[in-house]
Design a protein with these regions (language model features):
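Active-site pocket-lining/capping segments in soluble small-molecule metabolic enzymes
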Residues: 1-139, 144-176, 201-332
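Conserved catalytic-core segments centered on acid/base and nucleophilic motifs
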Residues: 142, 190-196
């Protein structure tokens, strides 16, 4: 990096202050994957895939925030089929949550942190049914923001009532702020964990040391999550946080949840802009971290939809993705 050389001539060294690089990788040996959040329906997914082709980049995962419960069964099946063909993981937020309910607490200034949690036993029942409904359509990845719900879903998975290949992605709404909290979520059965978008590289290194699970991190976040814009930092974030899902939100964009037909045109425009931001970040990575490897479409460990009927009899195998420590040898 030419800038580091200029700093060293003045007796300064930015590289010496950077935490050590992670030796952990995704199962395919890659360092990172690209995620586009707030992909709220099939039309938005198709726009993301089209924009990715235009920029000649790979989007490995998309996530959705409005909730699986707000998509019709036919649309869930179409979403699963299109994503499966493209080799893209689709992670749907479990729909029922306090932020949608009758109670005022989660919509208050001090209670907003409860918006993603599930209220009461009936709420848990609805949430589990929402997952089962999406699983029947082929979806295999879910955003969870309630520790009790996570525990129940993992228990059902262990009992063979949910597919072994299902993944449980911890939402930024329940992001751990320290390594101990991250370890708790790891122990409850999370398969990938979103940490706060404003972590320093030192804090990212601490989080990485606490778990071998993939970490999800907003490289750019919407204003509701702090509005950080860190595309130029992608090489450092990946090197320190590997295996890392680099998420691209969009500052100065409107909130979308819950999305519907009245917002889908805006959701498409926002999603296209996010893909463009990811393309810019990858240019920065090529400039400053060319040895860092991104997973290909359909890579091992991605929870790509399986648009085939689920049955307990076929539900066998290891439920977790391995994380390897060997440095990959394949080119980027």
């Amino acid at each position: 990096m030419k800038a580091d050389e200029a700093l060293r001539r003045l007796g300064l060294s930015a590289s010496e202050s950077r935490p050590a690089a992670s030796d952990r990788r995704f199962p395919d040996g890659a360092h990172f994957r690209i995620e586009i959040p707030s992909v709220e329906n099939l039309r938005v997914l198709e726009a993301v895939l089209e924009e990715a082709r235009r920029h000649d980049i790979v989007v490995n995962r998309v996530s959705q925030g409005s909730g699986a419960m707000l998509l019709g069964e036919s649309e869930l099946r179409e979403l699963a089929a299109v994503a499966a063909e493209a080799g893209v993981e689709v992670s749907l937020f479990v729909g029922p949550r306090e932020g949608y309910g009758l109670g005022a607490h989660a919509r208050s200034a001090e209670g907003a942190g409860h918006a993603g949690q599930v209220r009461g036993l009936r709420g848990l029942s609805y949430a589990i049914e929402d997952v089962a409904r999406a699983v029947e359509a082929g979806i295999r990845s879910f955003l969870v923001a309630d520790p009790g719900l996570l525990m129940l879903l993992r228990d059902m998975q262990s009992a063979g009532e949910l597919p072994v290949e299902c993944g449980w992605k911890i939402s930024v709404a329940m992001a751990p702020s320290n390594p101990a909290a991250l370890m708790v979520l790891d122990g409850l059965g999370a398969t990938t964990i979103n940490i706060p978008s404003d972590v320093t590289t030192a804090e990212l290194g601490e989080m990485r040391a606490a778990t071998s699970l993939p970490i999800d991190l907003y490289v750019e976040s919407p204003d509701s999550l702090g509005g950080v814009v860190r595309e130029n930092e992608l090489a450092d974030l990946v090197a320190i946080g590997s295996p890392l899902y680099a998420k691209f939100g969009l500052r100065n964009s409107r909130p979308l949840y819950p999305a519907g037909e009245h917002l889908y045109d805006e959701a498409i425009a926002i999603a296209r802009a996010k893909v463009a931001r990811a393309a810019v970040a990858l240019e920065w990575l090529a400039r400053l971290g060319s040895d860092l490897v991104q997973s290909a479409a359909g890579a091992e460990g991605l929870r790509v939809p399986r648009p085939v009927p689920f049955s307990a009899e076929s539900n066998a195998g290891d439920r977790d993705d391995p994380v390897v420590t060997a440095v990959p040898t394949q080119p980027r």
